[in-house]
Amino acid sequence: YAEEVLSYLAPKYNLYILSNGFRELQSCKMRSAGIDTYFDKIILSEDLGVMKPWPEIFHFALSATQSELRESLMIGDSWEADIVGAHGVGMHQAYYNVSGRTDFPFRPTYSMTDLKELVELL
C-alpha cells in the first residue's frame, strides 16, 4: 500500500524521510521498495549525530527542509522515536499503529492501523 499512498500524497505535499537509520541502508531499502522517487529529501540521525526522539533532530529537519512546524506532520510507526519526539517539539503526529497499541500516555494527532487511512486523514 505504501506506493499507492505515496503516489496520492506526493503531488499534494512535500515528503521527507526523517530516520535513525544509516544512509546506505535507507537508500537501498527505499530503492528496492520503489519509493525513493516520492521523497524530496532524506534526513538521517547520522547527519546530525542525534537520534529521534531528541528535539534537535526535529528542529534540524524543519530547518533543512525550510518547513514550518505548524504545517508539518510526522508519520511514523515508532511510538517513542517518531510520535513522542514530534509531540515533544509541538509537531502534529500520525501514528501508524501496527501493534494495535491502546495505552497511549497522550493522544497522537492521528492514529491509524492501515496506511491507506492517510488518504482519508489528509
Briefly describe each language-model feature range.
Residues E3, S7, Y16-L122:
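Asp-based, Mg2+/Mn2+-dependent phosphohydrolase catalytic module
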Residues P11-K12:
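Structured helix-beta-strand junction loops
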